[in-house]
């Protein structure tokens, strides 16, 4: 019948109509998302108008490229801190606003907030994830809180005390190399390279109880650590390689994977062996064997293996590896940067260098061998003041990134809207003339007890502050005191003819290295 033919719709037409409806629905959904994002963006821009900003390069780039990773960029950061003395707005391209804070009172709501309110922004840290995993540096939320609680005992005084002997041993090896080079006429030394190897040597001994002899002969593991750090810096400077599927198809990406595998395999092997020992010996016998060992100390790995939360649950091998790799990453470059700049500042101020040297001489008078002990660390007040003043002038990490998960109210009543990225400028705070008079002058007396009481605790934050402060800061300060004290005892540190140009990367470096001249001191001089 004809009407049956007419009503029997063509199957192709039905399919076409269905696809049209699906496409229309998808287009409507996309349009709705675009409109919602546009509304949210415009509302956010409106709320950010209360914050001052410097002129943009143009509408598309925003402030990208204004502050470069070189000496001129560092000077511009200082100038901006003098112009905007609390907070100002920058734009990364046309749509990414970033608030930069340079005043202690203004960073307080961020640094003192619970970790969930102002977690780290991982936009520029995700390159580290394949290497460091979910260690303290990159994790967040409940996992971070649990790991922080479990790792805190690893940095207790009882654990840190025996490490001082390890610091002495490592710096003695470095100084022996320096004296040999000086005898050969090579008194001009690059600090970062030498000190990085020394800090890695110490870390490997404290972390794994393993002596790689890396300061005197090549170590595959140490070479991989150094290569990973170098490759991450290189990748961060190439925007088109931010995408993983592109990066891992490059030669650098393949080298990064290979170095990651090598580091992970080494750490995994140590964990497996320690867990086997712990399982076969039992906790009591394992601890007793440690006290009878030559080092008489628990390594960092041992503490993590023994750690249990309130429910009696241990860290997994993957968790332990992540924390061990994080400790290696966070403990070698930052301390090497700090030590290099400390020696540079003392070289430029021989009067302070000499006063530090006299303090060390008095402390170690008639002591054989010349070794800094645990109790000595509290007996070096002026040297400690010089270390802190150098950390103020040249903080190893110049910025902290936070992303607000809720509105943050500032002291003057202005509000940082939820979802925005904040840069807590450690360098900006440390060079803010409202906080530090004559901020470019090296003056250790800023840190005497009287002056210290006049300032906010957040005016000096080389190790960050608040819930997410650096868990290893006491370890780092102890190592710095040992290295600086013994270096000044054995060498006169002199500035190079060429003034270094600062270069901020993951840590604060110097273009072409930081070069100083070392003059060995004779026993008679001492």
UniProtKB/Swiss-Prot annotation:
Keyword Metal-binding: yes
GO MF: heme binding; iron ion binding; oxidoreductase activity, acting on paired donors, with incorporation or reduction of molecular oxygen, reduced flavin or flavoprotein as one donor, and incorporation of one atom of oxygen
CC annotations in GO: endoplasmic reticulum membrane
Class of the enzyme per the UniProt entry, highest EC level: oxidoreductase
Keyword annotations from UniProtKB, A to Z: Endoplasmic reticulum, Heme, Iron, Membrane, Metal-binding, Microsome, Monooxygenase, Oxidoreductase
Family under the similarity heading: Belongs to the cytochrome P450 family.
Subcellular location: Endoplasmic reticulum membrane; Microsome membrane
Species for this entry: Rattus norvegicus (Rat)
Protein known as: Cytochrome P450 4F5
Needed cofactors: heme
Main location group: endoplasmic reticulum
Tissue: High expression in liver and kidney. Lower expression in brain.
Binding site residues for heme: 470
GO BP annotations, alphabetical order: leukotriene metabolic process; response to 3-methylcholanthrene
Gene3D superfamilies named among the record's database cross-references: Cytochrome P450
Catalytic activity entry: an organic molecule + reduced [NADPH--hemoprotein reductase] + O2 = an alcohol + oxidized [NADPH--hemoprotein reductase] + H2O + H(+)
Keyword Membrane: yes
Membrane topology type: Peripheral membrane protein
EC numbers for this chain: 1.14.14.1
